[in-house]
């Protein structure tokens, strides 16, 4: 076999937390693909991998309304594997400024950095980008307990699972060059 298993997995503490705390977005075309380096699932860049003057923009998400899901799709007969990436989050309050922002996102191929509740950053849409899919802007019916805003969903497909990023690298790509 050409893909030997070289390590095992030990049982971890039961302290993992689900959900996202912060999301960052940029146009996929802002990434300089040739300058993105990784090893063992972690980006190894020590400086930004964005075009000059570009940055990731912050999206603050409410508690328990954002998640990312990676689905491993392997086809034994063809010997191929791909990794579907999905990002979902909710922005409350329907308003003109957010509607314009949402329409801009819908028109672009995007890359996202997500920060999960365990303190890990991951880069989504690294090679091929992600696009908006199946998003809605519900008004809700009741005064409380229902969403009134933008329920946004993005999907992409990548050759590897999302790479982790260090906090230092995230700080570098958040600063406008």
Predicted regions located by residue number:
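Solvent-exposed edge beta-strands and adjacent loop segments
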Residues: 3-4, 11-88, 130-144
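Generic "edge-of-domain/loop-turn" microfeature
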Residues: 30, 66, 94-96, 119-121, ...
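Generic secondary-structure microfeatures
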Residues: 63-65, 85, 90-95, 114-118
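Oligomerization/assembly interface segments of phage tail-like spikes and tubes
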Residues: 77-96, 146-160
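A general structural signal for short secondary-structure junctions and capping/turn motifs
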Residues: 79, 102-104, 113-114, 142-146
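Short, conserved charged micro-motifs
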Residues: 96-103, 163-165
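Short, acidic/charged, Gly/Pro-enriched secondary-structure junctions
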Residues: 102-125
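Mixed-charge, glycine-accented linear interaction segment located at domain edges/termini
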Residues: 129-177
């Amino acid at each position: 076999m050409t893909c030997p298993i070289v390590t095992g997995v030990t049982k971890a503490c039961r302290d993992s937390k689900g959900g996202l705390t912060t999301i960052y977005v940029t146009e996929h075309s802002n990434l300089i693909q040739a300058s993105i380096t990784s090893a063992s699932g972690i980006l190894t860049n020590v400086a930004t991998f964005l075009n000059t003057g570009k940055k990731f923009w912050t999206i603050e998400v409410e508690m328990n309304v954002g998640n990312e899901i990676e689905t491993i799709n392997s086809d034994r007969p063809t010997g191929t594997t791909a990794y579907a990436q999905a990002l979902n989050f909710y922005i409350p309050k329907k308003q003109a400024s957010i509607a314009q922002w949402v329409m801009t996102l819908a028109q672009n191929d995007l890359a996202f950095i997500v920060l999960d509740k365990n303190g890990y950053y991951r880069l989504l849409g690294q090679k091929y980008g992600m696009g908006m899919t199946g998003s809605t802007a519900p008004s809700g019916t009741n005064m409380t307990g229902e969403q009134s805003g933008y329920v946004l969903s993005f999907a992409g497909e990548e050759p590897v699972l999302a790479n982790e990023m260090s906090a230092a690298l995230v700080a570098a790509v958040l600063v406008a060059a």
